[in-house]
């Protein structure tokens, strides 16, 4: 019997417009016996409805009133058990996405790889997913060796597509809650909160993993990582965020399979980077990415620079900058991907700058060229949108201008729209010894002075000998037309 006394659908799985027969289901990537679940009654767990978003409760109750199964699922259940306020509330149901849209006027269907319903309540979005089943690794027409083959798939292609590396490109095969469990990544994320009696359904000992603060993949780890290499990044993210340890079988394949990240679409990796580095645990995420050999597949230029002694300080600067970013997030202060990618790519920019620093061009022009080269290469791994890439380059281009402290033009930097981010970057450089601490102190003090005193100070100051040199580089000597060099 299925849930709520309905006949079970084992072996009969909704597959878009058709059904899989019992014989066809033999090819499904499911265990021979689907799991039975443990029911943890309300009296034996700590989750209260008062801790659940009222909008999530509205979605759960309306689905149930319409005759559908509805569960709060995933990270929200895990976090509530840990006493953490969830950032998002996700719902799992046997209602199809189109059914959900009919129930909620404020619903939008999104996604192609995974078809989802987003129910909007002002700024809050409750994500509703239909129970999914595993399926045979059949390739849909349009698949190719191209790691970005997802873009070539047509809307009327089959509901599931897998590339030659085993990566799932699209997956819209619906099933039962018992099958849905096996589509989730970690046991700790596979707990279902039942709105009917406020119990928790546990199919894979997820509650025990939460108590032990342990991350364990559901199924064979290598197969699961090949299905979706981003699961390796999720393992790092949850370990960093929650302080969980990776179960040995879950941990072992990561370094060996890290190259699979090279086949993940660059736009998706951008989103994953924001989750890793802009959620309050970026410094620990970075350390774990390095430990498991993942960072070099996200930021290969930076990883190569960090391995060289002249740029080791850039790694220290990144770790310090991530720690400061974490502190700002935990204090509810704003952060921006612009600053994040500046510190992530600074070592690579310095290396590129120094490799080009033999010609007659001014340092500032070389810095611009180095930024462009590094950004162009990085886009093949992580698609940084122009709205962040352009201001990131401006932030780095402003660094030499901090050396100009004499003359009235020095004050113009204070009015630049990127001044604040560039100033914070200067402070970070000074903190790790890349910039002169006295320079950072001067720019800190000048901001506190009235305009008249600012003008008097810059007019009275003699020209600095290091004016206009690029950040982290020695000042080059320019040659006279006759061949003699001058400073």
Regions found by a protein language model. Give the residues of each.
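Catalytic cores of the polymerase beta-like nucleotidyltransferase superfamily
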Residues: 2-487
